[in-house]
Amino acid sequence: MHSETICADLTADYTDVTGYYSTHFPHPYPPYVREATAHFQRKGKHYLLTSGTTGYLPNPSEAAIADTWHGPYQVQENSHLSDESHTSYHSQISSVFKVHGKKDLYIAMADRWMPKHMHLQYERYRELFEKNFNPDYSGNVQMDEEILKCVLDKNTSIADYVWLPIRFEGENAYIDWLDEWRGEDYE
């Protein structure tokens, strides 16, 4: 099991690593270990949007900002402020792109792996992951049959996709839920 995110330099032809790398976001165990890193640059800053490790169950994304590809990265506060489920709107960000011809429009693309289980909130299963991976866990959480069914139900062929614009306040990146939006609404 990995415990940190690694940024590695690639060779000029992008077919190998150079041997130079940096490590970020160390965490001892799931669900806090970061994965599914989406990198983008904006106004000279490097951004990494990451997911926790809860299988196909969604969890809170983290946004981090640095001056260089190798950091150090500063994790910002919650980037999904209106998401009461703490599941990044029941999705996992996989990529971010800047829209050509727009002044400052970046779109976060995310996979919604478990669309049949959007009623579940992160706090309901966070502690189950901690119980299974934290060797010092001393809580008394009981296995939740519905969560177990979700973990075993890995039918990702029914996945949905979520595309949302990223809103910036200064350097911080925020993703707000919008039932609908149009590129024409942005400069």
State where each predicted segment sits:
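Carbohydrate-active catalytic/glycan-binding domains of CAZyme proteins
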Residues: 1-187
